Amino acid sequence: MASTLKSLRALSAPSRVRLLALLNESELTVRELTEITGMRQSGISMHLGQMQEAGLVESSRDGKNAYYRVARDSGAETGLLIELAAAGVAEIPEHASDLVNLKRILERRENQDLVYFNRVAG
């Protein structure tokens, strides 16, 4: 478990708060986060690495994709920090467009899954 101070430091940048709020809604890849936020891939990867080191996010692999999500068993203190970040993200101007873009990405992902399963099921 990461220290509380390390977690607080990780949440000191609005960009990381935006990313954490999105990951609190759904598991996402770096490519999807890039598309949603308009941030550069290298910046997102750096932010995710810092939040992962702080124990705020975790990742899992599915084929060639790494999916990031809010840490599941993060402990009470870290869970509280995640809740506070999710509540405070509304103060960041880009958050409204992030949510619109997130919805679009999730709908596209769902449609791609349906096409795949319909093709496989024949």
Task: Enumerate the language-model features and the residues they cover.
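Short amphipathic alpha-helical/adjacent loop interface patches that line ligand
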Residues: 37, 48, 121
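A structural preference for long, well-packed, hydrophobic secondary-structure segments
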Residues: 24, 50-53, 89-90
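Alpha-helical residues within the helix-turn-helix
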Residues: 35, 46, 52-53
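Conserved strand-loop elements at the edges of beta-sheets that form or border functional pockets
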Residues: 10-13, 50, 59-61
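Conserved active-site tyrosine of GNAT-family acetyltransferases
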Residues: 51, 68, 117
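Amphipathic alpha-helical dimerization/coiled-coil segments
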Residues: 1-3, 76-121
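Beta-hairpin "wing" of winged helix-turn-helix
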Residues: 53-63, 69-72
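N-terminal helix-turn-helix DNA-binding core of bacterial DNA-binding proteins
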Residues: 2-43, 66-73
